[in-house]
């Protein structure tokens, strides 16, 4: 049985109406810029040697990439974000 969640605003609560952005720590900034540019059609709204802000809509940025090349890969059983998803109106 699926549970239908009534939006918080409809329940009289103050809640975001959409997610603003996500910031990701990356080891290879240029590789990630290329990946998000290709997969999400995101464009750079600001970048320097250590950070890039990218957007695919009218927001300043939806994805912030912060270069930290010294980071180690997390252990397989470490806590952290597993995934995020993006909705498309049409793939055609």
Kindly give the residue locations of the regions a language model identified:
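Conserved active-site tyrosine of GNAT-family acetyltransferases
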Residues: 32-37
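Short alpha-helical
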Residues: 31, 60, 92
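Generic structural signal for beta-strand residues in well-ordered domains
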Residues: 12-15, 56-58
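Short, functional N-terminal and low-complexity linear motifs
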Residues: 1-4, 20-22, 62-69
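Conserved short beta-strand elements that form part of the metal-binding/catalytic scaffold
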Residues: 43-78, 88
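Vicinal oxygen chelate
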Residues: 1-13, 18-27, 74-92
